[in-house]
């Protein structure tokens, strides 16, 4: 999470005012902490009641990623995918972050396994 943008009070501008929500997290975040905040964010999505979801999937919260200090594991990404799947929405995923090549594929695979769980995935 960048520390120079995405502040809680940033709620959008112009016609988009009120349609942006940020959930700032600290410098040290583990999977449990991440899921607690993800749960709140998904509640906001549910309240909005969209007909589809476009998800920007950052895999840089992974443990050992050179861009950060968070410690999410492949199991955490699996759980995150399952949580998103519970929205039961048509979803487009755009992968946009993740720089530790040794774990990037595994983390992506686990997220998509979680996301596909309602369709017979893991």
Provide a role label for each language-model segment.
Residues 1-122:
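A general "terminal functional-core" signal
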